């Protein structure tokens, strides 16, 4: 027997079957860096305009976690897909470097020494710490295959950035939008600083629950309730923060609620009528009588007595009082609550909050001096019992605010802070209008979420009592304590930041005379003794100015951005602060669209936690699977929800990746001997190959649209199904005979190769944004004669699908043929199961077809036998079909007869022929193979 295998055109390619991703990916990264692939990608783009994705800066602290990986890969997919679609898109990564977490780490290292060090020394250590982790994270991001301007990122501690941040605050001051006031704000007693809404997390917490009676000896009570006895009367409050009772200034009632005067156990009590029954049960009153009723409005101005201090607590009115729980009478401590503060302003009550930065009561606070607020809780309860003011005590488990950094419970504390007003210049109204009318929110529920946050948020507390950040440019009068600043002066100081080697360290290092304007007198008291403000800006103001520091300053970018993309927690963070800063100083949103993703959870849907032990680090996955599989995972999930991750999930994706890779490898293996000169024009392709290009073109359209719509899971599923089903299981399976057994330079083989080349060109463009390493590897293995001048796959120009598409009628006919092919496969299966045949080529098929079906099949002008991968196939009229013929309910007008193929099997192509050996020199070959061999021999 002759060795005819050597005469077959078997696939040949240096593109390896085994990916070895973890080993090969670093080489690809080196290649991208050497070729400046990011610049090459953008420079090759721009035919459709620009697209600006503005990077939300991660915090320069610690190694990357899976949330970082998800976020950066999503951005990378968008930037690459936009560039490859013709939209020039520079990706400028950024880092947020100021703030408490870094200062906290430096504090831990310095311990007690920090207290004696000047601010600029602490700041230098913070800067070094941030720089160290910035470099670590930069390497880790690049390892994920993310292309960007990594050598020129934006960094919030750069002098130019700090100068812009300080300058943006000056613009708010110029517009009258900034005020310094004593208001209750979130305060962390552990970190000794004010907190913004975005820096507060709500967790379950157990608090004391106490019902307290305030004596109401006011004779005016009789004018409201005829049956009242002021000597025995009380108003009852409920609180879960007993430590705030020393600072009580009033009891608040709702003006429209009905309040009852209740007789019980020898005393009289004022409670909201609707809550009397539940309170009686709580207090254990077996009997009680409602003596009279009145609206809260009639009780306004009556004077109660503080439970353990010799002072009055007035009855005041407020619309914030509810009947959801408690008594309908609200303990009011203006130094510890927003509504309490608002009521205090209305009634002229003292904003009383006598505690230090650690939350300890000052020496002047009788009974509780020196106690931390949480230590004071049980002591206050003891005091209430001692004076007979405690009606009931217990515990309550509820959602309570905690510090985002140290995880400790926080308090409301009135301190002097700097605020941006939400009402001045209609900032709130304008921000809400931008949310509703200017910005596209993806998913759509994001609009309502941020709308509600902005609608109900308080004024923005922008000051922090820390050292590592951009200082608030203001001078404090040492004579009267009032603050002074001026927008022009602030801009001048900000300009000095830009020129100083370490930016706003200038504020701490310069002599006082260099920052105080000559001859400046305090406008409040006329004094001229000044000191610098030591508060720094909220880091959310820092990052919220990034549009001004980056988009408006870099010529390759622009304002506003087309897209901000971060986790859903940023509705209250970066999206929120950026909107307020931009709306406040530019009068518009800084973004046209906002896209949010969910959190990464484990395979069971649980939050990743070190304590649970279910944290998965990107570095481990890259080492085990390769970054490419992590990228494929990002593209495969519905990332707008919480995203599950486990080894099992990634294992399934490894299998999917292998199938995609092998499909590409098969295509490349069959292009090894073709040059650009050998490619046929589309009108010379065989009908099957034209249909294959139609399928490829429609897949390309779907994939590109999915990229534009941010539906990356559709990209993954479309490409995977295409490679596995349309290509491997159908088209490539049909092509094998033509590719392997036809004459190497024949039109029928060149037609197949031409189609494969076009398919690969489309596949490369569709894969590259997600499977970046693999696409680059394929690109580097393309035959030299087929390659263009591009240095990277990402610089390939866009390809339109239109030239590949067929008319719908022809496409429908091909789909009918594929349905017939599927029916043939099912008809053959019983003979295969019974061992009568081993392969579909061992069969002869008779298609009994109705006239309409015959016309459709014959109108395709294709080899039906080859499409069905059988040795012989012929058509007969449907009415000649025997009873035993196979019928498929999915294909109308068809019956199938299956029998063993006639003749003998060709040793070269394995197709049966009744004309085997018609040439004596090749007795084991069919006429087709004989002609091919003779052509080779000649």
From Swiss-Prot:
- Disulphide bond pairs: none
GO MF assignments: aminoacyl-tRNA deacylase activity; ATP binding; isoleucine-tRNA ligase activity; tRNA binding; zinc ion binding
Sorted keywords for this record are:
Aminoacyl-tRNA synthetase, ATP-binding, Cytoplasm, Ligase, Metal-binding, Nucleotide-binding, Protein biosynthesis, Zinc
Q: Which domain of life is it from?
A: Bacteria
Q: What is this protein called?
A: Isoleucine--tRNA ligase
Q: What is said about the domains? A: IleRS has two distinct active sites: one for aminoacylation and one for editing. The misactivated valine is translocated from the active site to the editing site, which sterically excludes the correctly activated isoleucine. The single editing site contains two valyl binding pockets, one specific for each substrate (Val-AMP or Val-tRNA(Ile)).
Q: Which reaction does it catalyse?
A: tRNA(Ile) + L-isoleucine + ATP = L-isoleucyl-tRNA(Ile) + AMP + diphosphate
Cofactor(s) essential for the protein: Zn(2+)
């Amino acid at each position: 027997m002759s060795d005819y295998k050597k005469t077959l055109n078997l696939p040949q390619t240096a593109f390896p079957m085994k990916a070895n991703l973890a080993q090969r990916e670093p080489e690809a990264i080196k290649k991208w860096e050497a070729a400046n692939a990011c610049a090459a990608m953008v420079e090759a783009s721009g035919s459709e305009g620009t697209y600006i994705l503005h990077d939300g800066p991660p915090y320069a602290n610690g190694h990357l976690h899976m949330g970082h990986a998800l976020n950066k890969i999503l951005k990378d997919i968008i930037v690459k897909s936009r560039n490859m679609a013709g939209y020039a898109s520079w990706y400028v990564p950024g880092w947020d470097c100021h703030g408490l977490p870094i200062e906290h780490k430096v504090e831990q290292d310095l311990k007690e020494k920090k207290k004696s060090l000047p601010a600029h020394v602490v700041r230098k250590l913070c800067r070094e710490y941030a720089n160290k982790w910035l470099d670590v994270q930069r390497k880790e991001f690049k390892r994920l295959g993310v292309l960007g301007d990594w050598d020129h990122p934006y960094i919030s501690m750069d002098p130019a950035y700090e100068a812009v941040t300080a300058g943006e605050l000056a613009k708010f001051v110029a517009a009258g939008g900034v005020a310094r006031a004593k208001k209750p704000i979130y305060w962390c007693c552990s970190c000794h600083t004010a907190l913004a809404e975005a820096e507060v997390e709500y967790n379950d917490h157990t608090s004391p629950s106490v019902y307290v009676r305030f004596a109401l000896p006011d004779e005016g009570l009789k004018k409201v309730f005829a049956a009242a006895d002021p000597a025995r009367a009380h108003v009852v409050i409920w609180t879960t923060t007993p430590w705030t009772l020393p600072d009580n200034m009033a009891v608040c009632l709702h003006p429209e609620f009905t309040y009852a005067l209740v007789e019980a156990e020898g005393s009289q009590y004022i409670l909201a009528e609707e809550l009397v029954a539940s309170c009686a049960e709580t207090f254990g009153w077996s009997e009680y009588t409602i003596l009279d009723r009145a609206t809260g409005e009639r009780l306004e101005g009556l004077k109660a007595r503080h439970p353990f201090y010799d002072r009055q607590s007035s009855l005041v009115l407020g619309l914030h009082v509810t009947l959801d729980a408690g008594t309908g009478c609200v303990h009011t401590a203006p130094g510890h609550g927003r509504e309490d503060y608002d009521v205090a302003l209305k009634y002229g009550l003292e904003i009383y909050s006598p505690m230090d930065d650690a939350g300890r009561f000052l020496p002047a606070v009788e009974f509780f001096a020196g106690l931390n607020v949480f230590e004071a809780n049980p002591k206050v309860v003891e005091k209430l019992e001692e004076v007979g003011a405690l009606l009931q005590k217990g515990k309550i488990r509820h959602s309570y605010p905690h510090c985002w950094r140290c995880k400790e419970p926080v308090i409301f504390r009135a301190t002097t802070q700097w605020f941006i007003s939400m009402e001045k210049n209609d900032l709130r109204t304008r921000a809400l209008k931008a949310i509703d009318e200017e910005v596209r929110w993806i998913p759509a529920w994001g609009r309502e979420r941020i709308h509600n946050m902005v609608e109900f948020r308080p004024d923005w507390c922008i000051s922090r009592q820390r050292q590592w950040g951009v200082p608030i440019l203001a001078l404090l009068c040492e004579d009267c304590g009032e603050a002074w600043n001026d927008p022009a002066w602030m801009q001048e100081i900000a300009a000095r930041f830009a020129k100083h080697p370490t930016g706003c360290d200038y504020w701490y290092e310069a002599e006082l005379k260099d920052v105080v304007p000559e001859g400046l007198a305090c406008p409040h008291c006329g004094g001229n003794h000044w000191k610098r403000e030591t508060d720094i800006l909220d880091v959310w103001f820092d990052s919220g100015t990034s549009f001004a520091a980056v988009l408006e300053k870099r010529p390759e970018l622009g304002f506003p951005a087309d897209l901000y993309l971060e986790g859903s927690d940023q509705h209250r963070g970066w999206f929120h602060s950026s909107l307020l800063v931009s709306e406040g100083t530019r009068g518009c949103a800084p973004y046209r669209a906002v896209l949010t993703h969910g959190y990464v959870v484990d395979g069971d849907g649980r939050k990743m936690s070190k304590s649970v032990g279910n944290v998965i680090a990107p570095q481990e996955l890259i080492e085990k699977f390769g970054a490419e599989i992590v990228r494929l995972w990002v593209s495969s999930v519905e990332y707008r929800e919480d995203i599950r991750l486990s080894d099992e999930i990634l294992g399934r994706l490894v299998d999917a990746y292998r199938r995609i890779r092998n499909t590409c490898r098969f295509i490349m293996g069959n292009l090894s001997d073709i040059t650009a000169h050998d490619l046929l024009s589309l009108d010379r392709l065989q009908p099957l190959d034209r249909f294959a290009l139609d399928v490829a073109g429609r897949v390309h359209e779907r994939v590109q649209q999915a990229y534009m719509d941010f539906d990356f899971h559709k990209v993954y599923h479309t490409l995977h199904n295409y490679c596995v089903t349309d290509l491997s299981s159908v088209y490539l399976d049909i092509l094998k005979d033509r590719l392997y057994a036809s004459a190497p330079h024949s039109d029928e083989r060149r037609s197949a190769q031409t189609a494969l080349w076009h398919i690969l060109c489309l596949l490369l463009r569709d894969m590259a944004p997600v499977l970046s390493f693999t696409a680059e590897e394929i690109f580097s293995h393309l035959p030299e004669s087929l390659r263009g001048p591009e240095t990277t796959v990402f610089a390939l120009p866009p390809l339109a699908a239109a030239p590949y598409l067929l008319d719908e009628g022809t496409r429908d006919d091909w789909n009918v043929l594929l349905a017939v092919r599927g029916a043939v496969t099912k008809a053959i299966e019983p003979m295969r199961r019974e061992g009568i045949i081993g392969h579909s080529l061992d069969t002869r098929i008779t298609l009994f077809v109705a006239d309409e079906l015959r016309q459709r099949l014959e109108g395709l002008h294709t080899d039906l036998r080859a499409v069905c991968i059988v040795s012989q196939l012929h058509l007969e009229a449907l009415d000649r079909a025997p009873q035993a013929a196979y019928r498929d309910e999915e294909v109308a007008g068809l019956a199938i007869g299956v029998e063993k193929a006639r003749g003998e099997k060709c040793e070269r192509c394995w197709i049966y022929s009744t004309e085997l050996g018609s040439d004596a020199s090749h007795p084991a070959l069919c006429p087709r193979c004989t002609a091919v061999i003779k052509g080779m021999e000649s």
